[in-house]
Amino acid sequence: MTIEHYNLGERYNPRACERKWQAIWDEKKTFQTVQEDRREKYYVLEMFPYPSGRIHMGHVRNYAMGDVVARYKRAKGFNVLHPMGWDAFGMPAENAAMQNKVHPKTWTYQNIAVMRGQLKQLGLSVDWSREFATCDVDYYHRQQMLFLDFYQKGLVARKVAKVNWDPVDQTVLANEQVVDGRGWRSGALVEQRELTQWFFKISDFSEDLLAGLEELEQWPEKVRIMQKNWIGKSQGLLIRWALKSTEEADEVCKSFDEVVCYSTRPDTLFGASFLALSVDHPLAQALAQKDKALEFFIENCRSGGTTTAELETAEKQGFRTSLVAVHPFDVAVHIPVYIANFVLMDYGTGAVFGCPAHDQRDFDFARKYDLPVQPVVLPSGVEREDFAITETPYLGDGVMINSSFLDGLTPQQAFEEAAKRLEGQMLNGKPQAEKTVQFRLRDWGISRQRYWGCPIPMIHCTSCGVVPVPRADLPVVLPDDVTFEQPGNPLVCHETWKSVACPVCGQFAKRETDTMDTFVDSSWYYARFTAPFAQEPVDKKATTEWLPVQQYIGGIEHAILHLLYARFFTRAMKSMGYVTVDEPFKGLFTQGMVVHETYRDEKDWVSPEEISIVEKDGKRQAYKLTDQSEVTIGSIEKMSKSKKNVVDPDDIIASYGADTVRWFILSDSPPERDVIWTESGVEGAHRFVQRVWRCVALSAPVLRDVVPCVGKQGAALQLSKVAHRTLYAVEDDLEKFAFNRAIARLYEFLNIMAPLLNRIENVEDEMKAALRQAMDFFLAMIAPIMPHLAEECHAALGEKTLISELAWPVCDRALTVEECYTLPVQINGKKRGEVTVAATASEAMIEEAVLALDFVKVHLVKKPVKKMIIVPKRIVNVVL
């Protein structure tokens, strides 16, 4: 293909140029990864999108970041894999089917077509030949193969679990979909039901998943902490408490003569004032059978919030039973047993003892039910008679008090001493306690009572039980002839689809009608991208070459579930020989959101397109375009349709071009922080685009025939030094994801070049050669961020190659060495002036130069120097 540049005499037209270069890249297959390429491999991946209908600015920022990394690494000589796909199963497609009378498949693939076109408009350097959607039969066929592999490996379990059941929608709801006890969509009161569900045994990997976090040095510390807390390893004791009843002939107490509590703080046992059991504890269930009031209390608790966060923030409620627990260190002390709404059955044993003086939850409960609050930990340095628990519990360290044989010990020492004593005591012929390790992480329930998901390849036979679909009979394909006129899962009603012969005995059987959680789909897609057409789920040779993903990019909202499940999947696949790594993602970057001002009139939210903003008396005021009525300018918030502060990327690209959008969205804020979208910011970015083009258009007739070269002396040498220093700094910025810093340097660089380019015909030949090299550097540096403009300028300078295929320029380190630098000088912490020193100056030389400064000498007349604090290349502080 002949590469032609745009007419130099015209204003840069991004729409025409961007379409042209995208067509050239497609025709030349510039970004199609060649597996056999022996160069060092680099895999960059952004979390793939859900095809909701249209991309938003959050997508643009996410994929622009990944594209900068991909283009930069490609220029640095790596064989880059940068794929794209679609996380396509899920509830929104079923909602659309019900609301719009359209099949989920039709809705999904229509959205994919639209969003693919939008992403291509951005000029992403994606290998589209590897594209797939998780709803493609080819993809979920391989996912079913993985399920069977997991099943054979013992990593799949089928067991009864308590779920949130929406009686109107007739489906299970995730905890997050229960709002104030009601279904998020139907508004129906949610019921707690026990259903038989399919689980992946992620808990088998708890210790390994926790230990692996230490190796993820290129992950944000915040994400690692969140996963560590979610896995929730704790070391404690299982303590057996003898039970007694306050009522004679208590049949329940005869059946339950003891209860086991898990505690990480046995050192606080002498401060215990109650035992609390989960509403789902077997003892609570037994007591409720004979107590209607307790039965009502339990049902009321179950209708409230179900998430851990909701239980922690909800008002603490308890029901006092007829039972008391005998204190393990003092049989004369009996403490009441409650059924409480804040105790979780799926953590520990579903029973805890409460020490109100040293735990906020226990303190709140004790205050509500007028229970004793006995302090047993005294803060260090505080007299015992001066210490009391009044308004809040004491949560810190110290020494033990009011604790018999533990007095005077630290809590850590008391833990060991209490454990030793309890392990030596006997209750009903067994030690009263044993040390144990517990994890918060529970097995992953993957069953969903929905149609639009990957079918679980299992068959229910009345004779053989539950048996797997033979691998040769896969895939189990979703039927197309379903309707959504009634709530619930249409697969349950599809007799033709679910009726099947048992693969073991041949008798009549039924298919499993649950489908897999959509998090399963995204737990292994990164491995599939390495060989998307392999017959097996993944190709071991390909995964060995490409995994782990060197750089993964996405929102921090996926810090726990998606990222944890992907880590589990990689370990599981390694155990089956599919991959050779433990971790899927070597580097992780979590970008901030795109936010925008909100606008509101007396009735509703108003979109940015409906208003104009003017300055009045130094203040910004907003007015409706239709009737000039005043609009309130609200807070800056995440873009959302509900608040109408969404900006459509298509509109901005149509007005300014993709490069302007990419440049602005990466320039205005550090990438880990939120970026505030402003029209003025976009206009500023577009002015820069036009300025770059003007500089090239003016200088191209001269520079296209100039051989680039480093300046040898004078102004030409100084320009070359600036060019090489900028190249060196921008390279470092891109390695560190500091895109905004790189862009700031490029603004400065153009400011230095522009005056020289504007009078290019009048400069010396040496300067022309230095300018040509500087411009080549500049275009190479903007190319990852504004690829279309860089290509157009590169062609305008007479080049017949694609800048997207060029190597990154080589920096001459000798030209980057600063000969001198300037330091701010403080006297007693207040800046008084500056000092310029040689780049090689020692601290002694810096001190000598500072003492020779006139403004320093003036202060030395009154006071001598006590010390001088020198932070090299940062600051000097003279302390008098």
From Swiss-Prot:
Gene Ontology cellular component list: cytosol
Highest taxon of source: Bacteria
Motif 'HIGH' region, chain ranges: 49-59
Gene that this polypeptide is encoded by: leuS
A GO molecular-function descriptor: ATP binding
InterPro entries hit by this protein: aa-tRNA-synth_I_CS, aa-tRNA-synth_Ia, Leu-tRNA-ligase, Leu_tRNA-synth_edit, M/V/L/I-tRNA-synth_anticd-bd, Methionyl/Leucyl_tRNA_Synth, Rossmann-like_a/b/a_fold, tRNAsynth_Ia_anticodon-bd
Positions with a binding annotation for ATP: K641
The entry's keywords: Aminoacyl-tRNA synthetase, ATP-binding, Cytoplasm, Ligase, Nucleotide-binding, Protein biosynthesis
Lineage: Bacteria, Pseudomonadati, Pseudomonadota, Alphaproteobacteria, Hyphomicrobiales
UniProt similarity note: Belongs to the class-I aminoacyl-tRNA synthetase family.
UniProt keyword Methyltransferase, yes or no: no
PROSITE patterns in alphabetical order: AA_TRNA_LIGASE_I
Name of this chain's protein: Leucine--tRNA ligase
GO BP: any one term: leucyl-tRNA aminoacylation
Organism: Bartonella henselae (strain ATCC 49882 / DSM 28221 / CCUG 30454 / Houston 1) (Rochalimaea henselae)
Signal sequence residues: none
Any Pfam family hit: tRNA-synt_1_2
Reaction(s) catalysed (UniProt annotation): tRNA(Leu) + L-leucine + ATP = L-leucyl-tRNA(Leu) + AMP + diphosphate
Enzyme Commission number, as recorded: 6.1.1.4
